[in-house]
Amino acid sequence: MESLGINNIYNALDRIKLNAKMNILVRDPYHYDNNGNIVGVDDSYLKNAYKQILNWSSDGVSLNLDEDVNQALSGYMLQIKKPSNHLTNSPVTITLAGKDSGVGELYRVLSDGTGFLDFNKFDENWRSLVDPGDDVYVYAVTKEDFNAVTRDENGNIANKLKNTLVLSGKIKEINIKTTNINIFVVFMFIIYLLFYIISSTVFAKSCNCILIYVEVSQLMNSVFY
């Protein structure tokens, strides 16, 4: 894996060019490599995840995390799909201003224009990261426990409790299309204006007819009486 330049889950995600049917983000801030660097997950998990990613569909995905994971994503996850003219050559990390809880502070733009924002609570601050023309998808994420066969450092096989990060299918889609919205607003305004003009014209004609009728009636009354 190292020879391919893939030493953590983020590199793997960038390498395989995630699309709308393969949406995964794993963050384990307590997992380090031999040099003390945070790597997210080890090679053994990464190889398994790499295979699973290629086979998963949009119906939902399940991530098996190491048993010593102390913190895992839980709540909601946003996928922000940038248009082709916003593509970046390398991942970009943005820290949200005013965040002191450490929740919702990571936003990544992958090299294919797909971004992810993860947080434990739904936060409206994500809107500051979305530009006109972006497509935003919302996924529900939960953490579950299950029994799995594992291998320890000595090579011994045992059945231990593992944490599973479950990513649901797409539960909500938000289209940020200001151009389309503006066109729609202008179109509705034109319809309203035409309706107002027609209504005003008809109303004016009706008023004129009423005035003429009243004047004729008064004239007839003065003649015959």
Swiss-Prot record:
GO cellular component labels: plasma membrane
Listed transmembrane segments: 181-203
Subcellular localization: Cell membrane
Keyword annotations from UniProtKB, A to Z: Cell membrane, Membrane, Plasmid, Transmembrane, Transmembrane helix
Source taxon at top rank: Bacteria
Pfam families tied to this protein: PA_Ig-like (PF20835)
Coiled-coil spans in chain: none
Main location: membrane
Entry membrane topology: Single-pass membrane protein
Protein name (Swiss-Prot/TrEMBL): Uncharacterized protein pXO1-111/BXA0163/GBAA_pXO1_0163
